[in-house]
Amino acid sequence: MYLELQIKKTHIFDLKGNKVEEIELPIFFSYPVRKDLIRRVFISEFTKALQPKGRDPMAGKRTSALSFGINLGLARVPRVKTTGEAALAPNTVGGRLAFPPTVEKKLVEEVNKKEKKLAIISALSATANMNFVKNRGHVFSIDTLPIIVVDDITKLTKTKEIIEVLESLKVYEDVERVKDRIRIRSGKGKMRGRRYKEPKGPLFVIHENNPVFVKAASNIPGVDVILASDLSVIHLAPGGHPGRLTIYTKSSIDVLRKRFEGRLAL
């Protein structure tokens, strides 16, 4: 199936929020958004990080317990001699598990290579769609999507400077939304290094790695930074929901164009 896609144009912003140039977007920013594929590929990427777990084959079985038999007025569960304490059976304290987890369990959701590529393209297209970005809950005042800025942004070294850029681009409201919604996690996860639940805010897609910029941007709540060459559905559609508020550098668009354009025919 082939679709007629219209090439979109957009502006490039400087660090003060002024429009400095107009460019044609790669064709994949016009692709239809396949939410079903994005969800499947997100699950696939997410499950790749899961660690297989099992149980000690002898867990709950290190006992000499045997059933006392019948006609004693007792349940016929295995019992420890002399004490009569029930053991070994799944319904007893300290007994074995009836169906323990096994390391052989298949954890990863498998998807085809072309489906994975199409899902990333769909997620990229959603970042250029005002409806998807707003429906995801992001708050911003800018009227142009996707947001593309000059490459000089990666030279910034201070968190304060990056915040000023976000304010000039009229997207800092989304960071404030994240701040207001940070909350303590329920359950035991708060004791295991996952104390706070933090919503996802703006995503920076950059063309080259600059550790100083990455660290400065990561200090801002909800903000993530990723190389265009490493971009995946995990970053573009957290939770499998497309339409993350994304800020691209000018050169990152060229990297994405080389990576995806002309690879798929619809």
Curated annotation (Swiss-Prot):
GO terms for cellular component: ribonucleoprotein complex; ribosome. The keyword Cell membrane does not apply. The keyword NADP does not apply. One of its GO terms (molecular function) is rRNA binding. One of its GO terms (biological process) is translation. InterPro entries: Ribosomal_uL4 (IPR002136), Ribosomal_uL4_dom_sf (IPR023574), Ribosomal_uL4_euk/arc_CS (IPR013000), Ribosomal_uL4_euk/arch (IPR045240), Ribosomall_uL4-arc (IPR019970). Keywords: Ribonucleoprotein, Ribosomal protein, RNA-binding, rRNA-binding. Belongs to the universal ribosomal protein uL4 family. One of the primary rRNA binding proteins, this protein initially binds near the 5'-end of the 23S rRNA. It is important during the early stages of 50S assembly. It makes multiple contacts with different domains of the 23S rRNA in the assembled 50S subunit and ribosome. Forms part of the polypeptide exit tunnel. HAMAP family: Ribosomal_uL4_A. Part of the 50S ribosomal subunit. This is Large ribosomal subunit protein uL4. It comes from Sulfurisphaera tokodaii (strain DSM 16993 / JCM 10545 / NBRC 100140 / 7). The gene is rpl4.
